[in-house]
Amino acid sequence: MSEDVLLEEDIWEYKSIRKRKPQSNPDSTSVSMQTVTKGKCRPKRKGSGNRKKSVEKNSTPQKSEQRLRPSEDLDPCKDDSSVYAQESVSSLTEQGSPSTRPVCDGYCPSCQMPFSLLVVQTPRWHVAECLDTPGSVEKECPDGLLCTSTIPSHYKRYSHFLLAASRAGEYLVNSTANTVERKMTCSTAAKSSCFPSPVEDSQAEKPSKNLKNVPNNECTSKIKDSEQRKSLNITSESTSSFADVQKPQQVFQLTQTTDNSCKFEFYDFTSSQESVSEDLCSQKDTSQPSLLQSKADFSDWEISYSPLSTCEESEGEAEEEKEVKTSQNKLLKVQNFEGPESNTEVFKFKKQHCEEINTSSCLYHSEKSASQSHVDSKCSNSPCVDNQQEMLSAESSFPLNCNQEFQQPGLLSPAINTGNKESQDKGACVLDSVYSCLTRTQSLLLTEGGRSPLSQKNKVLRAPSVVLTNTDKMTADATEKGTCQESLQPAVKKEENLDSTGVCFPSPISKTVSSHSLASMNAKSSPAKELKQMDIGVFFGLKPKVKEESKGEACLSEGKQIPSSVAPSGKRPRQQKRKAEGSVEDLEAVEESSNKDGGDANVTSGGQRKWRKRFRESSTTDEGARKKQCPFYKKIPGTGFTVDAFQYGEIEGCTAYFLTHFHSDHYCGLTKNFVFPLYCNKITGNLVKSKLRVKEQYINVLPMDTECIVNGIKVLLLDANHCPGATMILFYLPSGTAILHTGDFRADPSMERYPALIGQKIHTLYLDTTYCSPEYTFPSQQEVIQFAVNTAFEMVTLNPRTLVVCGTYSIGKEKVFLAIAEVLGSKASMSRDKYKTLQCLESAAVNSLITMNWDGTLLHILPMMQINFKGLQDHLNKFSENFDQVLAFKPTGWTYSDSCLSVMDIKPQTRGNITIYGIPYSEHSSYLEMKRFVQWLKPQKIIPTVNVGDWRARSLMEKHFRDWMIEGSGHK
């Protein structure tokens, strides 16, 4: 499975969560949380708008509170299928009787209404409606914390912020108790839904849930390596100031032995807590990948904010914050141990013995872990651990400014672990984000807003023991209240000599712990303060956005990089619209994005730059911006020639620029400042001089159907049957190879009589593939023209006061109105600009049929955009003395439908005295015409030039080409 797919799965939580087999362990006093789902279901995007809100309100650990996941299908008969594990270790049974109405426990995370009041709705249904219509009620319930109303409408009339905060506070306070029958909840703040999610229960992890809310603490962690035992030392300093930013170093030293065992032991400092032991991993007989929280995003990188945010509730949060601080202080009373350096708290990691890990399972978990840990600037530890012989140690020191608004919740969580026994695991979830860090990226960058990039030193990889040492300097700033947008990220560098297949690194920090910390952090802010919404780009398959890097800073490292951007002021970055990778418009603009530097561009993990909003990038860009690269299908190999490549500025190595015809999508970028040799035919040359004011000295006119020598290479221009002046270009290379570039063309059987193509072996055909799909079947040009002529003649014969109108482009579709004018015996009236354009054709026949006099003709030529009922009515009103009816033709290839296989299927639109015929007149080849031309020409190689932005479209076209050639050779 590719990295991109895993990242997207992380975002949308595409995980199958099954009921875990209950364990009856007499020695264990803690209970696992278990969630039963009925199959795997994709989450609704709707819930992503209020993730933070749901965390603030639903983090209450009610005894039998039912938890909902966005990936679960809850129907009225299955509401009981998702339950908490009871505090006894007896087996869980499903209670889903279809004959009785299920009574759901728990509370709505939005309005705090008990689910037991629901009559028809399911909890998920109710929560979804609450989130869709959040309500603007600012009046707090008069009962406050004592509200036990059983009237559903009561929860709509009043807000229950205090009740929500109280339930969240109970969650925090209870986490310090010694009871072993404690249920732990994982934060869903970074997930794509506002619903609660299944949780992991570990007594050793409870205290860490509150880390985010620790006030006035500057927590310095130092992880140190010793010879006898690899230990992890965390230094905790308490200061009264949290405004200053310190710059310490961090060294992770991860030890891996040569065998496949991956074990570590987790020791804690607090001796007053009970020892607990629990299996946190899924059993082999279940298909649940892991209970690890995926995508636990502790910043707002992958979300954009709804404008529905206020600051009015900040004063009302004082009491809530005091309660939260009280519970925090209880949790963070950690005994200090003196180590080699002062104020160090020691905790150790030992490796555990792993079963032979299934490759796909390991990669699945580790990739999902990495996608989170990269964003959260830490390597998360899988809670599935056993104690054995080998030790994993990490050495780091990094001070963090830990006020209420900004913390690294996961980095310090192991330091306050309250258990004295290690958590154990028999499953295959040891592989984790450290492994992913090593295998997925070569470097992980950290940029702190406004400050210098990471100073990376002492990066050592010792092959025998596989010890990865990394020293980073990290800084952290206090951010705006209630935001949590800054995050630190360690830089982990993968060396080339690392045998990644043999590495199985458990990392020292648990995602579950981090999620708890985030839940605690979010519980103190008002639920309606900020409504978060999933980035719309993610919905369309894009990778998650990251914050913009600090102004003017770029931490470039060798190879692929995953940036960790930190906003210097803690403000939310402005949401930007993103274009899908590989889109036709920006295909060439993305090709070289991974190796260019730009001041106003940001490199994402996919290698695509995010540009400021602009409609079209200029051909000659400013310094720091990226210049488009000419795609290969516009270059003629073995020559210095390019075809229709004017939007890329000066192309290196190009000695001649060819223009096939005068349509804007082909001459785009060609201006009066063009100073390179331009080659085209006479009609196109006249249009370039007249319309674009290109200097005549740079325009080289080539005659049609005549071999010419351009820079030592023979070139021949052929009629492309597209628009006036449109040509196909045949190149004869010195090696004897013949290359045909069709430009835009409408294949016609008459081309099979071109002398230059008869018997000519074509090596490469650059083919106009605008309609290269079987559904693009429409009548020939001659049939459509004949239909328009007959219809116009009949209408004018029946009513001589009929005005015939034909739509046209700046250049193109002329054949239709010229044929009508000839049959009606009337000139075609047109605007001065159109008249001058047709004068460039230098055709006596055309000049005899056109005029700028609107009054003396039966046929008027209007721009295509004016061929609608309103535009035609306005035009008719100007000539109401002579005409009382309008017959309009709108010749365009885009109005065809599957039913329009012949002109008999063409139906008019009529409103009053105005009739409009949309006729399927195309200047591009239909699928069958293209197929016939290719089978006749028999090129050795075909290169499509249109609709090449999508690999699926390219693959489909290549399949058509193969089928054509096989079918053509079979006829021989």
Swiss-Prot record:
Signal peptide: none
Residue spans of biased composition, Polar residues class: 23-37, 210-219
E.C. number(s) listed in UniProt: 3.5.2.6
Binding site for Zn(2+): 108, 111, 126, 130
Catalysed reactions, semicolon-separated: a beta-lactam + H2O = a substituted beta-amino acid
Superkingdom, taxonomy of origin: Eukaryota
GO terms for cellular component: nucleoplasm
Amino acid composition bias (Basic residues), ranges on this chain: 39-54
Molecular function GO terms recorded: 5'-3' DNA exonuclease activity; beta-lactamase activity; damaged DNA binding; zinc ion binding
One biological process term in Gene Ontology: double-strand break repair via nonhomologous end joining
Keywords: DNA damage, DNA repair, Hydrolase, Metal-binding, Nucleus, Zinc, Zinc-finger
Ranges for region Disordered: 14-80, 191-219, 552-623
Ranges annotated as UBZ4-type zinc finger: 105-135
Transmembrane segments: none
Composition-biased stretches (Basic and acidic residues): 64-80
Record-linked PROSITE patterns: ZF_UBZ4
Record's function text: May be required for DNA interstrand cross-link repair.
Summary of subunit composition and partner proteins: Binds PIAS1.
Family under the similarity heading: Belongs to the DNA repair metallo-beta-lactamase (DRMBL) family.
Name used for this protein in its record: DNA cross-link repair 1A protein
Taxonomy of the source species: Eukaryota, Metazoa, Chordata, Craniata, Vertebrata
